[in-house]
Regions:
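Solenoid-like repeat scaffolds
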Residues: 1-6, 34-41, 68-75, 102-110, ...
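Residue-level signature for tetratricopeptide repeat
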Residues: 20-21, 53, 84-86, 123, ...
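Structural motif corresponding to the intra-repeat A-B loop/turn of tetratricopeptide repeats
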Residues: 22-24, 57, 90, 127, ...
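Long, acidic low-complexity intrinsically disordered regions
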Residues: 221-254
């Protein structure tokens, strides 16, 4: 569907903002996606972007509806894995498993099939079938030494499933393999390895510590103000005493003057 030039430019600007913000500020990305959706709801790319923005903010029912709309418009199966993952998000892992067995999966490219395998394994874990999840992830793609964009996540998911099954030594090995493939920091495999080795992560700043120059708590500030006020009162009292002593000296001098006059 083609749009008038001005409208197309407005839609494009909003879609650019969705792509730019979806990782760092999903809620803001979602807001931009809603604007694009109001402007051009019959454009497949807009429905897809709205779906991913809703997915990023865990609005799974809304995301699923948008992905379905985009698929109806394009006929593409590309969104099939993320649609299945939305079913998981909605607490329906059995539907995700059913989707993993549909003919659409065979039409996916290699990356899409790996994504579907990850979703299916996640659904197995949702249903408490950890051993089945491990078997689901075992594949030629997992065994391959070649590194692709999906390799770190596949190895990480396998390591995580092994750890849940109590197979710690194997889990450590696969977290290590995930880390080797993860050049972009897509996973926290290094942290998981450290945890398995007994490393504890603590905040550099303790709960009772305050950074230098930190403002005092309200109660502490009030106490400081009260102390300052007491000092001021004491100073005032001392000034009053000095004034009284001064008055007495003046009176004494006055008496001396009066006495000399009388004399």
């Amino acid at each position: 569907m083609s749009l008038p030039k001005t409208l197309a430019e407005d839609v494009a600007r909003n879609l650019v903002m969705v792509a730019r913000l979806i990782d760092e500020d999903p809620e803001q990305a979602y807001a931009y996606s809603r604007i694009a959706l109001r402007l051009a709801s019959r454009v497949a790319a807009v429905r897809e972007a709205a779906g991913f923005a809703a997915y990023a903010t865990q609005k799974y029912a809304e995301a699923l509806a948008e992905f379905r709309a985009s698929r109806r418009m394009t006929g593409s199966v590309e969104l099939w894995p993320v649609m299945a993952d939305c079913e998981r998000g909605l607490g329906r892992p059995e539907r995700a498993m059913a989707m993993a067995g549909e003919p659409e999966v065979q039409k996916l490219d290699k990356a899409g099939q790996v994504e579907m395998r990850l979703v299916a394994a996640g659904a197995r874990r949702d249903m408490g079938q950890i051993d089945a999840a491990i078997v689901t992830l075992q594949s030629p793609e997992l065994a391959s030494n070649a590194v692709h964009s999906w390799t770190p996540r596949l190895r990480y998911a396998y390591a995580d499933a092994l750890l849940e099954a109590g197979r710690e030594d194997e889990a450590r090995e696969w977290f290590g393999k995930a880390l080797e493939a993860d050049k972009d920091g897509a996973t926290d495999a290094s942290d998981r390895l450290a945890q398995l080795d007994g490393v504890e992560f603590v905040d550099a700043l303790g709960e009772d510590d305050e950074p230098a120059g930190a403002p005092a708590e309200v109660g502490e500030q009030d106490d400081a103000d009260d102390t300052d006020a007491e000092h001021l009162d004491e100073d005032d009292d001392e000034d009053d005493e000095d004034d009284d002593e001064g008055d007495e000296d003046d009176d004494a001098r006055g008496d001396d003057v009066d006495g000399s006059t009388k004399a």
